[in-house]
Every structure is written in C-alpha cells, then in structure tokens.
Design a protein with these regions (language model features):
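ATP-binding/phosphotransfer module of carbohydrate and carboxylate kinases, centering on a glycine-rich
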Residues: 1-61, 79, 102-109, 150-280
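Polybasic, low-complexity association/targeting segments
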Residues: 62-69
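Cofactor-binding loop segments of dinucleotide-utilizing enzymes, especially the Rossmann-like FAD-
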Residues: 66, 94, 241
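Phosphate-binding/catalytic loop of phosphoryl-transfer enzymes
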Residues: 69-163
C-alpha cells in the first residue's frame, strides 16, 4: 500500500492507494511542523488511522507538507516512522505537491493560497526559485490567516462600518475588547485567524470587505510574486481554498500586475494520486 498526503496548516488530505482498488480518501487536521511537534502529529495520525488500515501494510509514504523545510521535515518523518514502521518515507514541500498537481512536467509559476502562503518557480520537476513566505507572524501575505488578522484588527480598532461591526459581533460573540485576548489565547493562532475568512466570504459584496481582500492580494503580489524576475512571463497557478473563494478578487489584482491567470484549484490531491499511481 502507498499513502499520499498533502498537508497544510489546517487540513491534511490523505489518499490510500491499493493495487486494483479505488483510492481511499479522507481528511485530518493539518500538520505544519512549525506549529505542532512530532508527538502531537503521531497521536493525531494514530487516532485517525486506527480503524482504516493495518499500519504494517504500508510500504511507501509520500508526504507533502507546509513547513516541511529547513530541517522541520524530520519532525513529520519521526511521527510517521513511529506509526508506520515498515514504510519508506519521503517528505516534500506542499509547494512541490501543488506544482506536480497543476503543472505536471511543464515549467511555470506556482503558488499556494490557503491558511498559509507559498510561491515558487517550477522547472524540471523541482522548485528552482522560491521567495520565503516568512510564515504566519512575519509574512504569509494573501493567506487565510493573513486575511483573518486583517479583519480582526479592523474589528478591534472599530475601523469597520457599523453594519459590519454588528454582523461580526453577532456571528462570533466577540467585542472589540475581547477579540484581542481571544486571539492570543488561541492554541493555534494561524488556524484561529483563518476561520474568519468565512465572514469575509459572506460579506464580499460589501465594498469595505472587497477592498480588504484586494489589498491582501496586493500585499501578496508585492511581497511574494513581484520579487521573481520576469514574473509577468508566467501565468498565475494556485492551489488552496483562498484562491478559490476569492478568485474574482485575485484575478482582478493579477491583471493589474500584468500577470495571466492559469489554473486555480482547491486541492492537489487528485493530481498527486494520478502521479503516484504510476508506481502500480
């Protein structure tokens, strides 16, 4: 059996590939090693896999994950090794998963717009150039967590139109005085922030919200797209829920920067299944 996984900070999509059978697909929480440790990942995987398969039957695991760089990949690998002792394990970045899924063997610009953000240039099966997204605290412009921080700040400062202030308070039970403590008390603040994109989606027709979302994508372009030489020669290809939910605003901003829009998909898992089924 082969396991293929694509993990963001909020959700991991799993595919169990068995010869002559349909893939078994399911989701768990995300496992970004910048925010959770090996023990946390191991416990969660055991809880989610215990009734699905025999762990000893897994021979190969291909895990593509957010945060799996700079030595952090070993955290995920240690967790997987403890659960699946007979498996050979390959850990790659979520950006490479997006590239394989959307571009196949073609070269191009690839991005992730989910809870976090990532960008790169893909060529010959590898990411050959990558601007550091800097993560939740310092960067991740355009991501769900980034958008969430922006709307939380506007609410806390009472800088939103009164009708949006009232709607936000009614939906979440927060006030400008309680929203900041709630944010800092959250166990995983990137996930906590990202959940407020639902409010943005529900109110996207309001000019204040539309401008907030577009400004976040302008920040994305200025910090994570325009730093690539000749970026206008590529099309914008993106994986992630934020690119899907706010596709109209993303396309508007891309056009102002002279960049064509290519493929925008929610998840790379289907493309990864096709890629790795070649091993059967």
């Amino acid at each position: 059996m082969i396991i293929v996984a694509d993990s963001g900070s909020t959700k991991t999509s799993w595919a169990l590939l068995r010869e002559a059978q349909e893939p078994l697909l399911f989701n768990t929480e995300g496992y970004n090693p910048y925010y959770v440790d090996a023990a946390y990942i191991q416990k969660s995987i055991i809880a989610n896999f215990s009734h699905k398969i025999e762990s000893d039957s897994v021979k190969h695991i291909y895990f593509y994950g957010a945060g799996c760089a700079g030595g952090k990949d070993q955290i995920v690998k240690d967790a997987l090794m403890n659960v699946f002792p007979n498996a050979s394990i390959v850990i790659e970045s979520d950006l490479l998963a997006a590239a394989k899924s959307l571009l196949g063997d073609a070269e191009g610009f690839i991005s992730i717009l989910g809870t976090g953000t990532n960008t790169g240039i893909y060529e010959d099966g590898k990411i050959i150039n990558q601007v550091n997204s800097l993560g939740f605290w310092l960067g991740d412009e355009g991501s769900g967590a980034y958008l969430g921080k922006k709307i939380l700040a506007q609410f806390a400062r009472r800088a939103m139109p009164i009708e949006l202030m009232d709607a936000f308070e009614a939906e979440y039970g927060l006030t400008p005085s309680t929203v900041v403590p709630a944010f800092y008390d959250a166990e995983l603040q990137n996930r906590y922030s990202a959940k407020f994109t639902v409010f943005l989606h529900h109110h996207i027709e309001h000019i204040f919200i539309r401008n907030l979302v577009k400004k976040a994508f302008i920040d994305f372009f200025e910090n994570l797209v325009c730093l690539y030489p000749n970026y206008r020669s590529y099309s914008l290809n993106s994986i992630g829920s934020i690119g899907i939910i706010f596709a109209e605003q993303l396309k508007e901003v891309a056009l102002t920067y002279g960049m064509r829009v290519g493929k925008i998909n929610k998840s790379p898992i289907e493309g990864l299944i096709t890629y790795h089924q070649q091993g059967f």
